[in-house]
Amino acid sequence: MSTQVSASSLAQIPQPKNRPVANFHPNIWGDQFITYTPEDKVTRACKEEQIEDLKKEVKRKLTAAAVANPSQLLNFIDAVQRLGVAYHFEQEIEEALQHICNSFHDCNDMDGDLYNIALGFRLLRQQGYTISCDIFNKFTDERGRFKEALISDVRGMLGLYEAAHLRVHGEDILAKALAFTTTHLKAMVESLGYHLAEQVAHALNRPIRKGLERLEARWYISVYQDEAFHDKTLLELAKLDFNLVQSLHKEELSNLARWWKELDFATKLPFARDRLVEGYFWMHGVYFEPQYLRGRRILTKVIAMTSILDDIHDAYGTPEELKLFIEAIERWDINSINQLPEYMKLCYVALLDVYKEIEEEMEKEGNQYRVHYAKEVMKNQVRAYFAEAKWLHEEHVPAFEEYMRVALASSGYCLLATTSFVGMGEIATKEAFDWVTSDPKIMSSSNFITRLMDDIKSHKFEQKRGHVTSAVECYMKQYGVSEEQVYSEFQKQIENAWLDINQECLKPTAVSMPLLARLLNFTRTMDVIYKEQDSYTHVGKVMRDNIASVFINAVI
């Protein structure tokens, strides 16, 4: 199958007259990622050998901390995780936290120490252990309020704030803890010394639970090296590992950027967003580890194609053309291109090529069943795009519930979450695919967050250019409330959905933690990309800086 469509046919692509063209800004990166030259094999092998030696030393220190005292071990594990190198020590961390969990409530070493108790609670919850929140009762007064004396313990307050983000439904003490710590940390941040103020401000903007591992590691390396008692071996490992993984990511991105440039959609489909780099950043947030190279490549190609499909449906295609396109998608047959307009042929052929490539890879390993799931979620995605396009052209404003039924399918979450399993190893069994496509609670909650965060930040731009109504407009019309009231209500619903996610990540889990981590990480990417604005569509300073920090600038 070839992605080449006659260049002469491009002249037949309809001009933007009477089409809802969005005028997206062009790609801001040029060819800088294409021109990346990987370091030579000898240099890379030398760095890998250094890292292996440092890993052995850190592993030895983890073992030593485990036989020392719980506080020392918890702080070392926390540093390992926040510096982004925990993937090297998964078994050691699991064994250490299992041991701590068995005696956490009876541990005298941390009696009355808010910071270490909160740290232990957070680390155990992150690992999936159902540790009771009753451990915080000792920090409340007879009326159930947190003691005022805690306010002066800034590290303890910060630890409690982070721990509260791991709460589940019914844990009122942690809801109170979040309100208590947020209020007082905001009040004190400007009066703190620089080092502590930076940590507090960072946490208030994005707690650990909602941060992307690579972005957080990049930031925390600079914080950790300023700590008076940092571990030099661990810091050296974190820096070397970050830079080595960054070089692998740059090589991957270079190959993907070359593939994207050969398709030449920027020229041939100028109405669509050209966001290959941003898409790779998004997907690297789902799994950054070197062993998931194939998963990142597959996901990046799928999100790149999905972005084009999205723009065809709400930024260019006519109702008649879109009907032809959905029929072709349902058939999933290269011969269907004959009925399509020229610009759709380009997209359709490229889409089938991407899935053909996936299919060939899966066949080599006997995992071709995965392709069926991948194709079906893509078909569902396009069906949802088509339904929304019909609403737009019919000027239909659906009820909120009607809107959400379609919008949860069009958000892309189900498509990408399911596809993220395709590029993983044998851990992604057929049973895992059956589970992820059955809309389990963690999926529906994460998808809900994805849709609402997207709509909150993108609806104003979309309504200006002519776009299907968003959740915001549907809710305002149905309930007769203001835009600000909708935002407030949606934020409450988003936070409530996070409680569902936290609950679903506690043991015993429906599927293994590595699979759940993909779904959790997708939700985290939304907080990074959509918290301030739609940073995928409108690539501003925050997105540029984030991409530079993980793909361009090495750690020194």
UniProtKB/Swiss-Prot annotation:
Chain positions of motif DDXXD motif: 310-314
Single GO MF descriptor: terpene synthase activity
Enzyme Commission number, as recorded: 4.2.3.73, 4.2.3.86
Pathway: Secondary metabolite biosynthesis; terpenoid biosynthesis
Keyword annotations of the record: Cytoplasm, Lyase, Magnesium, Metal-binding
Domain of life: Eukaryota
Subcellular location: Cytoplasm
Residues binding Mg(2+) 3: 462
KW Lyase (keyword) present: yes
Reactions it catalyzes: (2E,6E)-farnesyl diphosphate = (+)-valencene + diphosphate; (2E,6E)-farnesyl diphosphate = (-)-7-epi-alpha-selinene + diphosphate
Enzyme class: lyase
GO annotation, cellular component aspect: cytoplasm
Keyword match Lyase: yes
Cofactor note: Binds 3 Mg(2+) ions per subunit.
Residues binding Mg(2+) 2: 310, 314
Family per record: Belongs to the terpene synthase family. Tpsa subfamily.
Function: Involved in the biosynthesis of valencene, a major volatile emitted from flowers of grapevine. Can use farnesyl diphosphate as substrate, but not geranyl diphosphate or geranylgeranyl diphosphate. Produces mainly (+)-valencene and (-)-7-epi-alpha-selinene along with five minor products.
Protein name: Valencene synthase
Organism: Vitis vinifera
Upper lineage: Eukaryota, Viridiplantae, Streptophyta, Embryophyta, Tracheophyta
Gene: ValCS
